[in-house]
Amino acid sequence: MKNILTRAAALVAAVVFTVLLASCSVTYDEAEIITASAELIEASYDINTVFFGSGLPAVESDDEVLRHFEIADDSPYHTKEEIKTAALAVYSPDYAEFLFEKAFVGFSVSVGEEDSIDADQIIDARYVEYGDRLVILPIAEEDIMKLDRTYDTSSISVVSQKRGRATLSVPSFVDGVPAEDITLTVVMTEDGWRLDTPTY
């Protein structure tokens, strides 16, 4: 009986190992990766604007007491969930978590000596929901990221791929001028390929 159980356990282990080995060795069609990546890169420009650039269009006010402006009616998104859904259609869940922390929670950055009073500067959340209204924290023009990098998505090459992760090399332009090739990563998720690195 003991020998039978031992053989059964060994057989199960062998099957599991074979399945794991097969899953690790799965490779995806490069044309599929390139097509999906091109679409994701193009879609990332608008998402980058929401999180790093000028943000969603807002109804501005001259009232100096107001720290946030209401999102305009013609905005493509009007709730946190809509923004999150749009971001997750482009970026991986792991990278999207960084975006959500920055946009909806806020964070601190080191700006001085470790022991100084200004060692950490608190950056407020950019988007806040008050009841059923989404508002945006206006930021100074000089603090808006200059999103001037674009990509030649017709010339994407797959450098490597392993375990549902592909490394790409993509020619880029800065202000329309040819610049260096950028290394980007895409990962396979439950919903398909997603960017796992920023494109700005």
What residue ranges belong to the model's regions?
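Bacterial N-terminal signal peptides that target proteins for export
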Residues: 2-12
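N-terminal hydrophobic targeting signals that begin at the initiator methionine
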Residues: 1-2, 25
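Mature, Sec-exported extracytoplasmic domains of Gram-positive
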Residues: 26-200
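C-terminal motif of bacterial Sec signal peptides marking the signal peptidase cleavage site
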Residues: 20-23
